[in-house]
Amino acid sequence: MGEIKSIKCSEVTQNELKFGIYHTSDFFPFMQKLSIPHRHNYFMILFNEKNYGSQLVDFKECAIDPMSVTCMHYGQIHQWIDFANIEGYIIVFEN
């Protein structure tokens, strides 16, 4: 396995605020780029309202269920697997 790239919060937010709230439909283009393992240098909260999906967190598959909340912390390794149908909001932020 190759080196796992770290993703900065500013790469996600596309600004220096180090904070962003996105509807999942607006976040899909960025999620597609992150369909390989990557390390977070920020925190992420996913509020999924509808449909099902999946992701890897520290190389373990985690389901994304309707009406669920997923929290990712700084340093975790993450990979989007099945995200095309989820609907909700993503919050990203640094300390």
Language-model features and meaning:
Residues 75-95:
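Ligand-binding loop in jelly-roll beta-barrel domains
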Residues 49-53, 73-75, 84:
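Short, solvent-exposed loop/edge-beta patches enriched in aromatic
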Residues 39, 71, 92:
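Short aromatic/basic micro-patch
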Residues 59-73:
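Short acidic-glycine-tyrosine-enriched beta hairpin
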Residues 1-56, 60-63:
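Generic protein-terminus/edge-of-domain signal
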